[in-house]
Regions:
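Per-blade loop-tip surfaces of WD-repeat and WD-like beta-propellers in eukaryotic adaptors/scaffolds
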Residues: 3-9, 14-23, 60-81, 106-134, ...
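Structural core positions within WD40/WD-like beta-propeller blades
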Residues: 55, 104-105, 148-150, 195, ...
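Blade-level signature of beta-propeller repeat domains, shared across WD40, Kelch, NHL, RCC1
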Residues: 275-305
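Short coil/turn segments that connect the beta-strands within blades of beta-propeller domains
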Residues: 50-52, 99-102, 144-147, 191-192, ...
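Blade-loop segments of beta-propeller domains
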Residues: 5-51, 88
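Canonical WD40 repeat/beta-propeller blade segments in eukaryotic WD-repeat proteins
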Residues: 33-46, 83-97, 128-142, 172-188, ...
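Ankyrin-repeat and related helical/solenoid repeat scaffolds used for protein-protein interactions
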Residues: 229-286
Length: 305
């Protein structure tokens, strides 16, 4: 993988040394009145114009969706859970449905619940067995309806169909971490494959036809996995980042690489990641480090970074 002339220099052992860069475009959120610590954010394009909607959720599960379009400034709508749960704030996450942008799912850790909303209208609540840690709507040929939600809860991966009433909507449940450690991340490929990872530093890729493990990549990082994303340029590659400052892009299927998970490329930031994410339809990624540095990169079809 070739590192082209961008806003960073290569240092020792894959460390990227940041340099000053000019911000081409930025949005300012005029109003985002959360009353508790923000736990998660999500971004989705607007279906009616070229703008974006930013969703943020606080530790109590109350979320705000804000329009980033200059023509429609300010907060769009806000909603919160119908029940107060245990009255304690903890992890919370929000994810939008790419097929139906108005549909959002909000996970609440202490409450062991996932609330589904259509804009600011509460649709239903899914009750998990353990504390949820990550959630996403599944995409791909097998999930054209856009109503299938995947949730990591403890060491388990649970699959939910929003159209089903039996068993509370849960259609499948499987063990994603054989050691019993918590799962922290989940990703879905364009082919419908589902990957999970967490504290045991293993990336497990599931076959959605039988919900059985298709591949296991052990010891992928030095510390526990906190984020996953399949490559849009090459579906055989997966991005993995962890609790420290490391990012690895490597093949997930060892059968096609002779039993090796040799990285296509990897790099380290200047300090621990506070946030890191990748676009769903391209290999454009960005991370924010504890030192206040923002890293951004793009891998094109020629395998140039």
């Amino acid at each position: 993988m070739e590192l082209k002339e961008t806003g960073a220099d290569a240092g020792k052992d894959g460390l990227l040394i940041p340099v000053d860069s000019e911000v081409v475009r930025a949005w300012q959120v005029e109003q985002c009145p959360h009353r508790a610590e923000i736990q998660g954010i999500a971004l989705i394009p607007s279906s009616s114009d070229d703008g974006f909607f930013l969703g943020s959720v606080d530790a109590y599960g109350r979320f705000i969706v804000t329009s980033l379009n200059s023509d429609i400034p300010g907060s769009s709508y806000t909603a919160g859970p119908r029940d107060a749960g245990v009255g304690e704030g903890w992890w919370a996450g929000i994810v939008f449905n790419r097929n139906v942008p108005s549909l959002a799912a909000v996970g609440r850790g202490f409450a062991k619940a996932v609330d589904v909303y259509d804009k600011d209208m509460h649709v239903r609540t899914l009750r998990t067995l353990q504390h949820p840690t990550c959630l996403t709507f599944l995409q791909g040929p097998l999930f054209d309806s856009g109503t299938i939600l995947a949730v990591t809860e403890g060491p388990q991966l649970s699959i939910w169909d929003l159209r089903q009433a039996e068993r509370g909507g849960c259609v499948q449940r499987m063990l994603g971490a054989f050691t019993g450690d918590s799962l922290n991340a989940i990703a879905c490929s364009s082919e419908g494959l589902v990957a999970v990872g967490g504290a045991e530093r293993v990336v497990m890729v599931m076959d959605p036809l039988k919900w059985t493990p298709r591949s296991r990549w052990t010891g992928c990082l030095k510390y526990e996995v906190t984020g996953l994303s399949f490559s849009a340029v090459d579906p055989g590659l997966i991005y993995v980042h962890g609790l420290d400052y490391e990012v690895v892009c490597a093949p997930w299927n060892r059968e096609k690489t002779g039993g090796s998970n040799t990285p296509a490329f990897s790099f380290r930031g200047d300090s621990r990641w506070l946030g890191f994410d990748k676009c769903c339809d391209s290999d454009l990624f960005a991370g924010w480090s504890e030192a206040g540095t923002i890293y951004a990169g793009h891998v094109d079809g020629n395998a140039d970074l």
